[in-house]
Amino acid sequence: MLCVAGAKLKRELDATATVLANRQDESEQSRKRLIEQSREFKKNTPEDLRKQVAPLLKSFQGEIDALSKRSKEAEAAFLTVYKRLIDVPDPVPALDVGQQLEIKVQRLHDIETENQKLRETLEEYNKEFAEVKNQEVTIKALKEKIREYEQTLKSQAETIALEKEQKLQNDFAEKERKLQETQMSTTSKLEEAEHKLQTLQTALEKTRTELFDLKTKYDEETTAKADEIEMIMTDLERANQRAEVAQREAETLREQLSSANHSLQLASQIQKAPDVAIEVLTRSSLEVELAAKEREIAQLVEDVQRLQASLTKLRENSASQISQLEQQLNAKNSTLKQLEEKLKGQADYEEVKKELNTLKSMEFAPSEGAGTQDSTKPLEVLLLEKNRSLQSENATLRISNSDLSGSARRKGRDQPESRRPGPLPASPPPQLPRNTGEQVSNTNGTHHFSPAGLSQDFFSSNLASPSLPLASTGKFALNSLLQRQLMQSFYSKAMQEAGSTSTIFSTGPYSTNSISSPSPLQQSPDVNGMAPSPSQSESAGSISEGEEIDTAEIARQVKEQLIKHNIGQRIFGHYVLGLSQGSVSEILARPKPWNKLTVRGKEPFHKMKQFLSDEQNILALRSIQGRQRENPGQSLNRLFQEVPKRRNRSEGNITTRIRASETGSDEAIKSILEQAKRELQVQKTAEPVQTSSTSSSGNSDDAIRSILQQARREMEAQQAALDPALKPAPLSQPDLTILTPKHLSASPMSTVSTYPPLAISLKKTPAAPETSTAALPSAPALKKEAQDVPTLDPPGSADAAQGVLRPMKSELVRGSTWKDPWWSPIQPERRNLTSSEETKADETTASGKERAGSSQPRAERSQLQGPSASAEYWKEWPSAESPYSQSSELSLTGASRSETPQNSPLPSSPIVPMAKPAKPSVPPLTPEQYEVYMYQEVDTIELTRQVKEKLAKNGICQRIFGEKVLGLSQGSVSDMLSRPKPWSKLTQKGREPFIRMQLWLNGELGQGVLPVQGQQQGPVLHSVASLQDPLQQGCVSSESTPKTSASCSPAPESPMSSSESVKSLTELVQQPCPAIETSKEGKPPEPSDPPASDSQPTTPLPLSGHSALSIQELVAMSPELDTYGITKRVKEVLTDNNLGQRLFGETILGLTQGSVSDLLARPKPWHKLSLKGREPFVRMQLWLNDPNNVEKLMDMKRMEKKAYMKRRHSSVSDSQPCEPPSVGIDYSQGASPQPQHQLKKPRVVLAPEEKEALKRAYQQKPYPSPKTIEELATQLNLKTSTVINWFHNYRSRIRRELFIEEIQAGSQGQAGASDSPSARSSRAAPSSEGDSCDGVEATDAEEPGGNIVATKSQGGLAEVAAAPADREEATQPAEKAKAQPLCSGTPGQDDGEDASRPRPLPEGLADAPAPVPSLAAPAAGEDAATSATAPATATEAPGAARAGPAERSSALPSTSAPANAPARRPSSLQSLFGLPEAAGARDNPVRKKKAANLNSIIHRLEKAASREEPIEWEF
């Protein structure tokens, strides 16, 4: 440190030395200059001045000298010090040496201490060493001791080992002896076991032989019983035939008798007395003959009954025997099982096998001659086969014998029958008829019964009524009948070919439903060769039960064919299998093995096999696919799809039912002739050997003749169907009656039989599905039927159809309810608009729905169908086009209302088919979006959990989410969210919804679903679905829906009596949303929290603390509640305080009285409730927790009474309209749960230039977009809510002027004649008046892009509103006409706006949809007589008489105002309802969204109300 300081000091000293040297030089220089200057001064200055200055200069000189002397001395001193310091030697090396010495001294100290320690340790070690020396001696002694111990141990161990060895040897000898003993005992036991085994084997053989005997006996008995039953049945059939013949004869005799009676009466009138005797004689002879016939009939009936009784006895006996045999069999089986269990593991069958082989070689090889095959068959099988062949021979001989003896026996009995007028020869039963439902009347006029057909319905339905009951014939009856007829044909062959019948009778248990052997198919190849019948697939399934189908192979082949010919699975499923695309995809992708399929599950594979068997099927299907691709929009396409849809259960062969629309009568005739050939072949194969050739030729001639007659009828029917199609004139009622018999006779049972009775009753068509196509007056449908019918028509079915026709005709006359859209030729452009949607919708609808085109006007159609049909039609009236469609709100109130088409107020407007709402369509995902998620693993469970949370948090229902984001139905969404599949198990299509969910969570998709935050305007809603959704979610659950403000209720001063208000209000109760529900007792709606949109944005609960959270969030976060306890407490509070459930429901829960009553009476447990279902209980709990709950409800009740009295008073004092409304109750007092919001809202007054600007904007765009509204607001320095309200009020005023004029015109009796549908279509009830812009910011629901789309109320074409020029023309009077004060006391108009005279608007503007009214109170300062009230007072039932808002009522009485009086202006007084101010609540987006939804409902109700004839309104 010192050396550093010294070096520093040296440097400083050096610097100062150099500075001093420099200063010395400088001072010398300056001194010289001073001397020179003084010299010059002496020279230049005058002397007197020098004298004056001399002393001063001298003193300066002296001072300078002294200073210089001082400085020199100082410098000298410094230099001496400096020299000395320079001479001092460098101290650094000395310091280093000192430091080293210090270190050495330190080390010395350390070494001394260490030495001391070492000395100490050395002393210790020395001591230890001494001790160790002493221990060595002891160690040696110890070692010696150890050696001794070891020696002793060794000796002990040896002795112990010897002892043990001895012991073990003894044990071994003993065990060996025992082992020998056990061996002896086991050998003896083994011998016993072998002996037992032999005895058991012999017992087993015995039981097997017994079992075999039992089986053979059982088979013999079953075959014998089958033979007996068959004989009984043949007797029964013959008896039936005779009975029928007798009945026919009896009928002819009765007719003769009646005709004779008639003639005798006539004769008696002419000649009374002389002919009495003859008359008596003739009558007596006829009566005698009739009595004989009746006796014969009675005898035949007795025979039939006796045969039936014997048959039932036989059945019972056989059943009891079978059960006994089965019991025996079970017993034997159980013993057999026990024996087998004993034999397991011990049996040795080699010897038995040898014996069997020798037996086979000895017994069966020569007799059967089967060669190598028999060697593989077991002995039992060979014995069974032998026995079976013997039994079958025995059975055939017995049948032929009984046949011969039976015919011989009957010859004597049937002798009188041969003398009858028309004896029927006992011809053999016919072959299986083409149409299973027809009566087999061409040979013996009765059904054929066979053992295979003895089903449960044998006696009940078929025997009791020989003609099949059409409407109730189910699949089972058909199936059994078909099998009966099949078996009958087989038996008839069996009778002829006794030798070849060995395979017909199965020796297995007797089955009623199936033929176990497939051989009948081989024997009668014509069975499958016939044209398709509706039940052929079922019969094929039952016949070919035995044959197994390789399902995987068939599915593979079908897929190959579909891919090869580019046929879609939907088309294939629709036309071939009768299944949906999803089912087809499932069957083809994962075909189940044949043995795991049910009978119904096997059907599609039979159909697919049939489909693959013929190339024509594939080509026909390909042509259909091509046609559908070429013109998918054709409306008629659906008609051709529908007919096969009803028959698509038939089978895989589709060529017979797929017909192009162009095919004409030539093809029909061709197909008929082909069918005739097939019939002939069938008859030839079925013809027994005994029948003569002449009879068969006669039959075939008859068949061909009937077929050709049928063809002629078909062509006539086609012509008749085509004629009306060429011109729009409808088919009249007579035409229908001409056409329907032909069609019905053509296919009496062609489609009925496909459906079971339940399905037929569910379809809303009378008697049978095919009647719809036959009876519909539609050209394409008739044409289609005409082409399809020949393929399904057997000869002789026309007679059978007559019975079907009568009930159908009566049904048609009564009025049947068709669910087909009415295709109107008047509006082709509309059809083009909707056809693509309809075809889409139709593909998803059930195949049972009938649709056909119709050129018939509504009135005639309604005459045909009657009131029930029209009522049905109005139920089925969904309007897919209008976002404000009223269809979903319409409620049928009976035929008395004028809502059916024939008495609708729009006689001239054509009925246009409204498509069912199309499936929710969402824009497809981009390839980029697919690629991001498709190949990465997504946790579906976590994803669905997040989605559910987000949906619950934002209060979005699953239906909206499904429609807007996923493009799925609510059910699919619910299923997906509750049970998500793992990502790895999903197909590409199955992954798409999850990708969409992920994109939605990330904010890349479907943002229109979420409520928009922070916007002044609520979201623009574009579809009915999105508008209606919040209703279904809980009817604006987070809005104070039930507390409908003044804009939702009739004005308190409206001139209505209470009884009339009851009419309108009771109808409102039927509204789907409680938002617009009012009391049934004529009270006004609950105005609590007057428009709660301002005072309480989120819930109608009277709790200010919860305003931050929406009710959905409260429900989602609430713990499990005791629903029973809550309801019990609520009921107690209500009853104790005498509060009604209606008031509580509307004010607190937002529900109707009925819903509240249901909730309180039958509360569900919390865990079984959905989020929506939990909401009322959360509201109840919050209400119960509120200390002021009862007081608030009591206040509401009191105010309701006051308002009711006020209304009655105002209805009485209608003639003084200028009574100031300031005396009205301020509904915010006590009604609002937040008592701090009690200030009335100030009136907004617009300047004239602001009004002019807004009017100009209105003329350009009456429904401005949110962007336009914001621009206007910023330009005019107004609030956006003010601009929105101004537009809304202005539109309402213009519409009201038109409305009042129309009412006035109607009151003069001219409305009915002049009013056009378009002018009446979209008229709305008036809304708030004037330019007052206070109130809640309403949300105008606009079409996208700001287009003004108007929808006609009857579903006509959407029109764009009229051009601005027309609008300008319409609105000019509004600016020119002067306001007239209502009475002398009314102050002038503050805002200075002119009233407008009523003037009709252009049609386009009239048709524009009504604006969405705000939820605000009516404009402040309105006069009650013209003050606008909510359009909600209009009810949803279109035909209902309704008491409208005040404008309508005030304009109606002709005494109060002249017909063309200008509309009266509102006064400047405050409105009846004060609006509380709430700054914070204003921007709540949830409130706005709910308000928008409410407004849309109100708008739809306006439309529904304005559709009616004004003249029909009752006041």
Swiss-Prot record:
Domain of life: Eukaryota
Keyword Ribonucleoprotein: no
Record note on modification: Phosphorylated by PKA. As cells progress into S phase, a fraction of CUX1 molecules is proteolytically processed into N-terminally truncated proteins of 110 kDa by CTSL. Cell cycle-dependent processing of CUX1 serves to generate a CDP/Cux p110 with distinct DNA binding and transcriptional properties.
Residue spans of biased composition, Low complexity class: 514-544, 1045-1061, 1313-1328, 1406-1468
UniProt xrefs under Pfam families: CUT (PF02376), CUX1_N (PF25398), Homeodomain (PF00046)
Biased composition (Acidic residues): 1331-1343
DNA-binding residues: 540-627, 929-1016, 1112-1199, 1239-1298
Cross-link (Glycyl lysine isopeptide (Lys-Gly) (interchain with G-Cter in SUMO2)): 783, 809, 840, 1279
Record field: compositional bias (Polar residues): 393-405, 436-447, 853-868, 884-906, 1032-1044
Site (Cleavage): 641-642, 745-753
Cellular compartments annotated: Nucleus
Presence of keyword DNA damage: no
Compositionally biased intervals (Basic and acidic residues): 828-852, 1365-1378
GO biological process: inner ear auditory receptor cell differentiation; kidney development; lung development; negative regulation of transcription by RNA polymerase II; positive regulation of dendrite morphogenesis
Assigned GO CC terms: cytoplasm; neuron projection; nucleus
Compositional bias (Pro residues): 422-432
Region (Disordered): 393-453, 509-546, 644-666, 680-702, 769-871, 884-923, 1032-1105, 1207-1242, 1307-1488
Family: Belongs to the CUT homeobox family.
Subunit structure: Interacts with BANP. Interacts with SATB1 (via DNA-binding domains); the interaction inhibits the attachment of both proteins to DNA.
Protein name: Homeobox protein cut-like 1
Species: Mus musculus
